[in-house]
């Protein structure tokens, strides 16, 4: 934002002559004649953010003032020439008048003398009025240009302030959107963590505890800068200063043209006020610069926090993926080992079943052979025969149910005196 202070210092030119008459007054040697004008009110705001632009504007202002000063000096030199010419004519007329006075006065000479005095007085008045009107015209033209420039500067400043406000609002909206995006990412990651934890909470309880310890709650507290109030306050101050300056300008234009000594004192007071306003504007500029730096720091902090959150969530997601892959590998290895143990157990049961069948077959064969062989009855008096029968059934879902029946027969003298049956169940 560039604002230029256009100041017009009091312009003076000094003339020293032997004698001249201005406005009916005779000025002696060493008399100082100065022309001055009131400076226009200063702009309400100055921006020193761009030193280069300020220096160039200051140089242009100084150059324009120097050119105006030279033009005024040239114009005043022409006025001096006219005054000298009039002085010479005055001297000539005075010499002629002295010559006429040396002669015998007549009525015609008195008439000429009175008319001459009247003409001189009118000439002095016209000359003074002409010079005053020309100076006033130049001052009014320059003041009009200054007011137009000031109006343009005020319009540019207002547009720039509105653009800055829109930019600040856009930055605030972007920061809010970034914060909401981060919150949504955090919620999605937390839901994914809860889902993974719920799936594996029964099988891997120890991993669930580790995940619970590693859970990170992120809370972000973003300070929302109150830009609207600050800009409203600045605009209020700006409008107040602009209104005050406009009021002072109107009062100055309605007031009469003051004499040169009062103008010098007034210019000194205005210069002091200008310096004071420049200091105020410097302080305002520093405050706005601090606010801008604060907003930039807040933006950088938000971006840094966003990057840290993304990196941390990426690391956590990678660790969760690795843990999930490791658990899947462990589960697969456990399933493989369980299947291998089941297969070994099934093989052992099959071997045991085959052995039991062979034992039962041998016993039946042995009992048949014993029944065919003739043996004295006394030898079988205490004989106990144990008969074992095997009943196998297939059960659904891959389980094998086996019933083993042990039958005991007690015979004496070829007669069965006692018989018992015992059943054993085995499931595999």
Curated annotation (Swiss-Prot):
Name listed for the protein in its UniProt record: Glial fibrillary acidic protein
Organism name: Bos taurus (Bovine)
Record PTM Citrulline, positions in chain: 26, 32, 266, 402, 412
Subcellular location: Cytoplasm
Region (Linker 1): 101-111
PROSITE patterns, sorted: IF_ROD_1, IF_ROD_2
Region (Head): 1-68
Occurrences of domain IF rod (ranges): 65-373
Family according to the record: Belongs to the intermediate filament family.
Region (Coil 1B): 112-210
Assembly and oligomerization: Interacts with SYNM.
